[in-house]
Swiss-Prot record:
It comes from Homo sapiens (Human). GO terms for cellular component: aggresome; ciliary basal body; cytoplasm; cytosol; membrane; mitochondrion; nucleoplasm; nucleus. This is BAG family molecular chaperone regulator 3. It is found in: Nucleus; Cytoplasm. The modification Omega-N-methylarginine is found at R139, R261. There is a cross-link at K445 (Glycyl lysine isopeptide (Lys-Gly) (interchain with G-Cter in SUMO2)). Residues 327-336, 367-381 have a biased composition (Pro residues).
């Protein structure tokens, strides 16, 4: 690039060579975007449109011709002075005036006064001109910032002012010049760089980072970007050397908040999903997120809250923060926002207590209120649950898997002392046992609310099992493996039953068994409630308990949101 830039510069110099040679320390370069020559003063490390060979007023004219060299403007296509004209500028070059010299010396200060509003205005225009900006403005802006560290303020100010006064057009040429100057200076080894403001950007870095910025800058960073420019200037000098990274950092502030919503890859998956669906919720929880640092911290928490939030809509994620809420996030009904926030608190509890699932059970059961007490005691319930599961097996011979699963549960009940991971698995399997009974008792179609709820809870428990960290312990790993196998078997059985049994006739008969299992599982609670309420289903009582049970898992406090919950999972079951 440097060669190319230099040669054009030389040509320009010769072209302008009509005039005397440039003063020492000056260099002419051609703006690759506009084709206009601009001048680099290596002495002051600035660039200008004005020809130093013309009376020194030139630079001072700059303020008046902040948009373009006033003198040069005449020499160069007057269009430059007619800011709107800049036809030669690439569309993107709108925003950053490079009038570092004039701007820096005189205008910086005035501009600085305006810059903020100017920048905003400018930003807005830039946003409008985003397509144009995309090419150079980004480059211009990032580079301006880089070169402008010293001049950055000037550039920002100049940019702000021109945008304010002349709008993008003026900034365009300056931006272009800025870009070109920065690029050329970048291309010029140290001289160019130094001229630009001693940004020492690697030569290659000139325009690339800008592109990144454009994405962020246009939407998120525009307002903040000017702030970022000013705020980050000091850091930028060092940072800008690594152009792209700097931008990310700068936009880190701008960026981070955004990413929280959509940008961060994983977060976006987890929170992005939730952010999209529950962006309000997310914003509520992650309000901290705006600051990048906090964002990270929040991210951890938010994920947990998210899991819970999601849990409500998608019980699958499991209340365990570990469970992958990300996928579920999208499913979150907007209504869950409050839940999410509340969830956070709950989250911390579950997180701290590996047996949170039991607590969740309690919450779940609480809505039905049938057997909240049993869930609290996971150990005992686990033991009884195994016999119950056996009974279930007896009732439903097809459920051989339950029989297999049953033994592990007693063993796991003994295991609690072994390892928190085993305890977690045990607690999950307790729930699964209740769900298993519900499956055995289930009679209906796949569209029934009961079916959907059981399936959702089973999936949630599956995710919970996945989220258990074996920490390299074989016993935990084995317990988890067995639990996953069992849950999968139960899911298969449920599918078969739903297909095979269109009617819900047996539900009444099975009610007693459901009641028995209620203690171990919310699912059982649901089953019992369903069976009892089947007659009242028209009244919608069944929906309320079901939704409540789901919600408790997601958020016990989210009782207000049951309607949304019912809508999401419950509607299918409405039939």
């Amino acid at each position: 690039m440097s060669a190319a830039t230099h040669s054009p510069m030389m040509q320009v110099a010769s072209g302008n060579g009509d005039r005397d040679p440039l003063p020492p320390g000056w260099e002419i370069k051609i703006d690759p975007q506009t084709g206009w020559p601009f001048f680099v003063d290596h002495n002051s490390r600035t660039t200008t449109w004005n020809d130093p060979r013309v009376p020194s007023e030139g630079p001072k004219e700059t303020p008046s011709s902040a948009n373009g060299p006033s003198r040069e403007g005449s020499r160069l296509p007057p269009a430059r002075e007619g800011h709107p004209v800049y036809p030669q500028l690439r569309p993107g070059y709108i925003p950053i005036p490079v009038l570092h010299e004039g701007a820096e010396n005189r205008q910086v200060h005035p501009f600085h006064v305006y810059p903020q509003p100017g920048m905003q205005r400018f930003r807005t225009e830039a946003a409008a001109a985003a397509p144009q900006r995309s090419q150079s403005p980004l480059r211009g802006m990032p580079e301006t910032t880089q070169p402008d560290k010293q001049c950055g303020q000037v550039a920002a100010a100049a940019a702000a002012q021109p945008p304010a006064s002349h709008g993008p057009e003026r900034s365009q040429s300056p931006a272009a010049s800025d870009c070109s100057s920065s690029s050329s200076s970048a291309s010029l080894p140290s001289s160019g760089r130094s001229s630009l403001g001693s940004h020492q950007l690697p030569r290659g870095y000139i325009s690339i980072p800008v592109i990144h910025e454009q994405n962020v800058t246009r939407p998120a960073a525009q307002p903040s970007f000017h702030q970022a420019q000013k705020t980050h200037y000091p850091a930028q000098q060092g940072e800008y050397q690594t152009h792209q990274p700097v931008y990310h950092k700068i936009q880190g502030d701008d960026w981070e908040p955004r990413p929280l919503r959509a940008a961060s890859p994983f977060r976006s998956s987890v929170q992005g999903a939730s952010s999209r669906e529950g962006s309000p919720a997310r914003s509520s929880t992650p309000l901290h997120s705006p600051s990048p640092i906090r964002v990270h911290t929040v991210v951890d928490r938010p994920q947990q809250p998210m899991t819970h939030r999601e849990t409500a809509p998608v019980s699958q994620p499991e209340n365990k923060p570990e469970s992958k809420p990300g996928p579920v996030g999208p499913e979150l009904p907007p209504g869950h926002i409050p839940i999410q926030v509340i969830r956070k608190e709950v989250d911390s509890k579950p997180v701290s207590q590996k047996p949170p699932p039991p607590s969740e059970k309690v919450e779940v059961k609480v809505p039905p209120a049938p057997v909240p007490c049993p869930p609290p005691s996971p150990g005992p319930s686990a033991v009884p649950s195994s016999p119950k599961s056996v009974a279930t097996e007896e009732r439903a011979a097809p459920s051989t898997a339950p029989a297999e699963a049953t033994p592990p549960k007693p063993g796991e009940a003994e295991a609690p002392p072994k390892h928190p991971g085993v305890l977690k698995v045990e607690a999950i399997l307790e729930k699964v046992q209740g769900l298993e009974q519900a499956v055995d008792n289930f009679e209906g179609k796949k569209t029934d609310k009961k079916y959907l709820m059981i399936e959702e809870y089973l999936t949630k428990e599956l995710l919970a099992l996945d989220s258990v960290d074996p920490e390299g312990r074989a016993d935990v790993r084995q317990a988890r493996r067995d639990g996953v196998r069992k849950v999968q078997t139960i899911l298969e059985k449920l599918e078969q039953k739903a297909i095979d049994v269109p009617g819900q006739v047996q539900v009444y008969e099975l009610q007693p068994s459901n009641l028995e299992a209620d203690q171990p599982l919310q699912a059982i609670m649901e089953m019992g409630a369903v069976a009892a309420d089947k007659g009242k289903k028209n009244a919608g009582n069944a929906e309320d308990p079901h939704t409540e049970t789901q919600q408790p898992e997601a958020t016990a406090a989210a009782t207000s949101n049951p309607s949304s919950m019912t809508d999401t999972p419950g509607n299918p079951a409405a039939p």
